[in-house]
């Protein structure tokens, strides 16, 4: 089994939060699920620049960490829906605060991030 050379520091709450919600599309997924977009195909349409494989991987990670729940309906064709858990709902306030911070400093960081490689 693969073992990371540098173990994750889980003694800090911030590191744990970043580990759970730190993914390129996780904040978008959580915001869209909160808006009522619950099916994987709808989530992919709402984030077209992300591949379905990556979105499914990140949804699986969010489910594993207890941030979202996945409900599989027993119908044909199969129907899957995601919803936020109480942990997922509680992280929204943090995500929206980060969004507000980003909006406030957008001009400051836009050029730096644009040319960051």
Q: What name fits each language-model region?
A:
Residues 2, 31, 89-117:
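Amphipathic alpha-helical dimerization/coiled-coil segments
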Residues 8-54, 74, 81:
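N-terminal helix-turn-helix DNA-binding core of bacterial DNA-binding proteins
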Residues 74-98:
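Basic, amphipathic "hinge/linker" alpha-helix immediately C-terminal to the N-terminal HTH DNA-binding motif
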Residues 71:
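Short beta-strand His + acidic residue motifs that chelate non-heme Fe in jelly-roll/DSBH
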Residues 58:
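Residues within the DNA-recognition helix of helix-turn-helix
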Residues 1-7:
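Acidic-glycine-rich active-site phosphate/pyrophosphate-binding loop
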């Amino acid at each position: 089994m693969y073992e990371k050379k540098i173990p994750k520091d889980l003694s800090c709450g911030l590191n744990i939060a970043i580990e759970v919600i730190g993914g390129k599309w996780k904040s978008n997924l959580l915001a869209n699920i909160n808006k009522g977009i619950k099916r994987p195909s709808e989530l992919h349409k709402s984030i077209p620049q992300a591949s379905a494989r990556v979105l499914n991987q990140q949804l699986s990670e969010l489910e594993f960490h207890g941030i979202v729940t996945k409900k599989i309906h027993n119908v044909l064709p199969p129907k899957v829906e995601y919803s936020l858990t109480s942990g997922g709902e509680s992280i929204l306030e943090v995500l929206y605060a980060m969004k507000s911070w980003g909006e406030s400093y957008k001009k400051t960081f836009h050029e730096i991030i644009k040319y960051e490689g």
